[in-house]
């Protein structure tokens, strides 16, 4: 990658973080997308700022031949639109090469939820005789009880928990805060983690702030767990619980939270608020899952099903 492209990418990421307040994971996705295009573009001259629409079409065709998924390509186009839109506003370009490029069609896939019995088995999988096991039980309980995104869970600051009132203050997408009730079960395990496990993981030493805030969930190095670490934990506990790990993901716990609430009669608007969705249309996909559940119940138990 050319040094000029590396410099342009850094400036874009700095600007976008300052103006939009996007999450660190989103910035890293933008970086990967732009660096991938820059490396493919190496040697062609002009770098990222000199690319035209024809070259972008060539890159998209190359990605198709390389078996990149349509979802990955759609995200790439979103990154490039943000990047070249900023270049256009700043006068670094006189046009937007992503204009008139349509994103690939994405089939609307229904979120996959675990059954309630599978959730119970998964939550019971950690070894409660170890500090890490207690921490993991609290994390799993909290993710299912509050419907958190994995990034929200691993980045949750200690000050975001109010055990007296039984609520979490969660910072979601777009740096938007929301209050989420804990529930008795998740509050119980969170209290046990804070009382019995966290001091041992921290070796009774102060936990340093990360990005200005002290993390709630830590490992033995007194650092927050990464999304990848938590992903691996969920897969491991799925195997312990007798569930195919390929069918389980951290986001699946969020899907299960939403689906089970709807199955038990939750209001769609309330669910939207709990999930932190900016648009109700994003939440409505769960009604399809709930409807399928009701149809299966009817077919199984109604005399004329």
From Swiss-Prot:
Domain Tyr recombinase: 109-299
UniProt function note: Site-specific tyrosine recombinase, which acts by catalyzing the cutting and rejoining of the recombining DNA molecules. The XerC-XerD complex is essential to convert dimers of the bacterial chromosome into monomers to permit their segregation at cell division. It also contributes to the segregational stability of plasmids.
Name this polypeptide is given: Tyrosine recombinase XerD
A biological process from GO: cell division
Keyword line: Cell cycle, Cell division, Chromosome partition, Cytoplasm, DNA integration, DNA recombination, DNA-binding
Positions annotated as active site in the UniProt record: 149, 173, 251, 254, 277, 286
GO cellular component: cytoplasm
Segments crossing the lipid bilayer: none
Family: Belongs to the 'phage' integrase family. XerD subfamily.
Molecular-function GO term, any one: DNA binding
Organism encoding this protein: Xanthomonas axonopodis pv. citri (strain 306)
Subcellular location: Cytoplasm
Ranges of residues in domain Core-binding (CB): 3-88
Subunit structure: Forms a cyclic heterotetrameric complex composed of two molecules of XerC and two molecules of XerD.
Annotated InterPro entries: CB, DNA_brk_join_enz, Integrase-like_cat_sf, Integrase_catalytic, Integrase_recombinase_N, Integrase_SAM-like_N, Recomb_XerD, Tyrosine_recombinase_XerC/XerD
SUPFAM superfamilies: DNA breaking-rejoining enzymes (SSF56349), lambda integrase-like, N-terminal domain (SSF47823)
PANTHER family from the UniProt entry: PHAGE INTEGRASE-RELATED, TYROSINE RECOMBINASE XERD
Organism domain of life: Bacteria
């Amino acid at each position: 990658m050319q040094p000029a492209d590396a410099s342009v990418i850094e400036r874009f990421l700095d600007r976008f973080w300052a103006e939009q307040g996007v999450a660190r994971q989103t910035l890293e996705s933008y970086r990967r997308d732009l660096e991938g295009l820059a490396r493919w573009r190496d040697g062609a001259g002009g770098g990222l700022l000199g690319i035209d629409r024809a070259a972008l079409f060539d890159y998209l065709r190359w990605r198709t031949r390389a078996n990149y998924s349509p979802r990955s390509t759609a995200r790439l186009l979103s990154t490039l639109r943000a990047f070249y839109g900023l270049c256009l506003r700043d006068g670094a370009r006189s046009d937007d090469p992503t204009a008139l490029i349509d994103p690939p069609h994405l089939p609307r896939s229904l979120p996959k939820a675990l059954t309630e019995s599978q959730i119970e088995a998964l939550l019971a999988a950690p070894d409660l005789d170890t500090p890490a096991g207690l921490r993991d039980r609290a994390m799993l309980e909290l993710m299912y009880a509050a419907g958190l995104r994995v990034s929200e869970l691993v980045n949750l600051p200690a000050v975001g928990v109010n055990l007296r009132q039984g609520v979490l203050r969660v910072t979601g997408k777009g740096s938007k805060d929301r209050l989420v009730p804990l529930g008795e079960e998740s509050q119980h395990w969170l209290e046990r983690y804070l009382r019995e496990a966290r001091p041992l993981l921290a070796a009774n030493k102060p936990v340093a702030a990360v990005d200005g805030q002290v993390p709630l969930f830590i490992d033995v190095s007194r650092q927050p767990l990464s999304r990848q670490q938590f992903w691996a934990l969920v897969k491991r506990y799925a195997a312990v619980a007798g569930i195919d790990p390929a069918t389980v993901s951290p986001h699946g716990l969020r899907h299960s939270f939403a689906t089970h609430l709807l199955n038990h009669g939750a209001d769609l608007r309330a669910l939207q608020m709990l999930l932190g969705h900016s648009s109700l249309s994003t939440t409505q996909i769960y009604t399809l899952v709930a409807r399928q559940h009701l149809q299966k119940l009817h077919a199984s138990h109604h005399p004329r099903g």
